[in-house]
């Protein structure tokens, strides 16, 4: 009975860790509709990277502590590339066949900082002007690379 209880508890944590991802929005739509709220003016949205390396996520059934947001990846944000809506990235990415290799350039600033090559950058940049005097945002940084 103890083994069954342990397995059921473990299964609950595994199920809880799932993100649902979606790559149907443009980078500008992601910033304006997902990241910023009322009272924020957004301009100069640029994205450099693969189309499946950026999207939105629903974290309500996960343990990351953020209900929704934008996800960027050096691989794919989808665990089934070619689909627009998905059950998110699969991890851990601990073997050579578990990631998506785009063979795309990395980030020049990171390359200069670490003194080695970087690859498959997903860079989302934008300017914003808040109407108020305070800006808050939540983020989670997760990586197999750093």
Pin down the residues of each PLM region.
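Bacterial Sec-dependent N-terminal signal peptides
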Residues: 1-21
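Aromatic (Trp/Tyr/Phe) and Gly/Pro-enriched flexible surface segments
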Residues: 18-146
């Amino acid at each position: 009975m103890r083994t069954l209880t342990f397995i059921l508890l473990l299964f609950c944590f595994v199920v809880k860790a799932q993100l649902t991802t979606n790559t149907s929005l443009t980078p500008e739509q992601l910033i304006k509709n997902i990241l910023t709220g009322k009272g924020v003016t957004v301009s100069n949205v640029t994205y450099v990277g693969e189309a499946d390396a950026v999207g939105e996520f629903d974290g309500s059934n996960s343990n990351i502590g953020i209900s929704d947001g934008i996800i960027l990846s050096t691989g794919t944000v989808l665990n089934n590339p070619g689909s627009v809506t998905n059950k998110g990235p699969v991890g851990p990415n601990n073997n050579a066949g578990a990631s998506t290799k785009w063979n795309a350039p990395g980030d020049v600033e990171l390359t200069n900082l670490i003194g080695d090559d970087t690859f498959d950058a997903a860079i989302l940049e934008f300017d914003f002007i808040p109407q108020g005097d305070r800006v808050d945002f939540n983020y989670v940084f997760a990586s197999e690379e750093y």
